[in-house]
Amino acid sequence: DIERRSADYSEGTTASYDYFTQLRERTRTLDGIAAWTKVSLTLADRGQGNAVYGNMVSGNYFSLLGVRPALGRFFAPDEDRTPLTHPVVVVSHGFWQSALGSDSGAIGRAVTVNGNPYTLIGVAPAGFRGVFSPLRVDAWVPLMMQQQLRSTRDLEDAAWLRTFGRLAPGSSVGQARQELTALTVAYIADRGERGGNRDYNTIRLSALTGLPADAREGFLGFMQLLLGA
């Protein structure tokens, strides 16, 4: 059964970038898999800085959730391919109102994120706060910028990501768990790793508590015990 305790989805990071991309390419029970991780940001517009809670996300994060921007756009496919090439940022509707004065002209504006030049490309819809409800996210940046914003992490191997997916039509939670477990075991075998005493036979699935109750159906946050070197 799907786990409903939000704590299950918030405890630690669970996937390396390499593991995430392999799951995304090989899954058949899920329509898509996206990844995110938390990051502390200082976002400054015209010299006025604001400390915000942010997320770094895969390029399909918003599209998989079916979220549409209130203004501007979300991340394009080419902004999710090459590290450090697309310094762009999306802000929450609340941040746009409180820090940017509800200025529709803010789209395309040069801002700074942790002192680095970025372009503001979009505003999330009112009420959208990310996929983990206890925390309100005010800014989203591409995973590909992680070396600039989290320089101690290696994009390929470190276990620094949380992942979620959307069930494909006709697929059940049980089928998704079985497939994800098999893909995880195969991933470990391909890398020549051994699990020691860790149990790889259970994939914990949880509801995405940050989404409205009527929008959660079909979405699964998942945790596994591997991950990374």
Descriptions of predicted regions:
Residues E79-R81:
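Conserved, non-catalytic sequence blocks in retroelement Pol enzymes and Pol-derived host proteins
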Residues S40-L41, Y53-P77, H86-G218:
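Mid-to-C-terminal secondary-structure elements
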